[in-house]
From Swiss-Prot:
The gene is ruvA. It comes from Citrobacter koseri (strain ATCC BAA-895 / CDC 4225-83 / SGSC4696). It holds the Pfam family RuvA_C. Residues 155-203 are annotated as: Domain III. Homotetramer. Forms an RuvA(8)-RuvB(12)-Holliday junction (HJ) complex. HJ DNA is sandwiched between 2 RuvA tetramers; dsDNA enters through RuvA and exits via RuvB. An RuvB hexamer assembles on each DNA strand where it exits the tetramer. Each RuvB hexamer is contacted by two RuvA subunits (via domain III) on 2 adjacent RuvB subunits; this complex drives branch migration. In the full resolvosome a probable DNA-RuvA(4)-RuvB(12)-RuvC(2) complex forms which resolves the HJ. Residues 1-64 are annotated as: Domain I. Gene3D superfamilies: 5' to 3' exonuclease, C-terminal subdomain, DNA helicase RuvA subunit, C-terminal domain, Nucleic acid-binding proteins. Belongs to the RuvA family. SMART domains: HhH1. GO terms for cellular component: cytoplasm; Holliday junction helicase complex; Holliday junction resolvase complex. This is Holliday junction branch migration complex subunit RuvA. One of its GO terms (biological process) is DNA recombination. The lineage of its organism: Bacteria, Pseudomonadati, Pseudomonadota, Gammaproteobacteria, Enterobacterales. Residues 65-142 are annotated as: Domain II.
Length: 203
């Protein structure tokens, strides 16, 4: 199916990006750690995609590189982990941070993510660690955690509302999302900055 898209970014509404390719607009769901690295609207971007078909929808998930996509595909093979939860996991921490948490057997780092309880965290560590034995060489080098940066978008009046909506889409309850954003909100912050700082504070 669709494995890669290259086109112009029409809209960025975390965690969704609308990418125009050949006159067709594709809605792509992206982990926030990948979303932060996208260029601004109107610029060209390339995303590696995974196509998911459900009874009620057909969804595209996008990533900045093949390694992140591979990790996402391995995550959704885990019992009890669907695309939405996998997206939340890779939004709350970088792919490298997740790999590190699994290899160091740190369930406490995972239970801080929305939708991850103790049993799910332990199951992820057991199942993913076994898969990493064959995949790690193709995923990430055992280096320091990835440092993700992107130019901040101009602040908007509804930046806080956009940030809350994005956190809810990632699995946080509305009241919890509002509380997370209010703790770090400031007038000059863009929605992307608020989301990034809220997720960082949650960990």
């Amino acid at each position: 199916m669709i494995g890669r898209l290259r086109g112009i970014i029409l809209e960025k509404q975390p965690p969704l990006v609308l990418l125009e390719v050949g006159g067709v607009g594709y809605e792509v769901h992206m982990p926030m750690t990948c979303f932060y690295e996208l260029p601004e609207s109107g610029k060209e971007a390339t995303v590696f995609t995974h196509f998911v078909v459900r009874e009620d929808a057909q969804l595209l998930y996008g990533f900045n590189n093949k390694q992140e996509r591979t990790l996402f595909k391995e995550l959704i093979k885990t019992n009890g982990v669907g695309p939405k939860l996998a997206l939340a996991i890779l939004s709350g921490m970088s792919a490298q941070q997740f790999v590190n948490a699994v290899e160091r057997e740190e369930p406490a780092a995972l239970v801080k993510l929305p939708g991850i309880g103790k049993k799910t965290a332990e199951r992820l560590i057991v199942e993913m660690k076994d898969r990493f034995k064959g995949l790690h060489g193709d995923l990430f080098t055992p280096a320091a955690d990835l440092v993700l940066t992107s130019p901040a978008s101009p602040a908007t009046d509804d930046a806080e509302q956009e940030a809350v909506a994005a956190l809810v889409a990632l699995g946080y309850k509305p009241q919890e999302a509002s509380r997370m954003v209010s703790k770090i909100a400031r007038p000059d912050a863009s929605s992307e900055t608020l989301i990034r700082e809220a997720l960082r504070a949650a960990l």
